[in-house]
């Protein structure tokens, strides 16, 4: 499909279309070239995207939850907030009860790794979060997040915590090797550690 807002190509198979008691399955490959996502979803913060992906999805029903499995996702161009990101890859599983995935970006102005998992307990409605990220280099001015001039950051972070149905957080979040750079110089902030726990009726951060 080619249009004034870019092109898209899909090779997709559908399963269980006429069987109402089974979830609909979708599998295949999708490729876009300069497809203006922002115009499609009416969002000014997003623009053209050039990508390739191979995925499988299940459109759930009352007996089967929805799920998306991304086997490969390679983004050559993604315009977001008026900046063209490049060289992004991702894999992962997304469902109504969780997420488990990995994202790597080697853009000239944003180099980072994110790997994490999220799970929601259907019984207690408690959510478990566990992730690690390493931002090797982020030029916040170049990617239009800081308009004041030179603004660069480097850090790593990890987290392992549970969020209860009441909103309480229990676990730890560690942010380390924080280094900031602006027009006045470079600043090594060091490490920040947050620990939260509860005992009886006491909640401590």
Can you say where each PLM-predicted feature lies in the sequence?
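Interface amphipathic segments
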Residues: 1-205
